[in-house]
Amino acid sequence: MASTAKATLTFDRHMPSEVPRIALVDTFEDEVRESVAVAKAMQGKLQGVRLDTPSERGRVTADLVKEVRAWLDLEGFKDVKIVASGGLDPERIRYFIDEGAPVDIFAVGSYISDARPIDFTADLHEIER
């Protein structure tokens, strides 16, 4: 695929309509340009854009989220949600909230999957009434 818009349109053609259309928008171009391009290409069927910028490129910041939201709104895509992901933990989520970043969904992965195990037992006991 040569663009995120083309990839998202292909996904849209082949997936059942009940599957949400959320596009990862930091692959080929700037996140803002890709977000607007995909929203335009999807003609009202895009539910969200996912920002997952790697740390080598500055990672997802509150300013980036605000800029994406401003451009989506300016272009008439106020209903498109913004998903933030990429190394999120409680501190990073608090940062976005404190900065007033308009994140609709926080996608948390490795913080949960890499969590320290909690040792416990689950015993069954019969209790007479």
Regions found by a protein language model. Give the residues of each.
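Buried, small/hydrophobic-residue-enriched core segments of structured protein domains
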Residues: M1-E75, P90-R92
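Gly/Ser/Thr/Ala-enriched C-terminal appendages of enzymes
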Residues: R59-V80, S85-R129
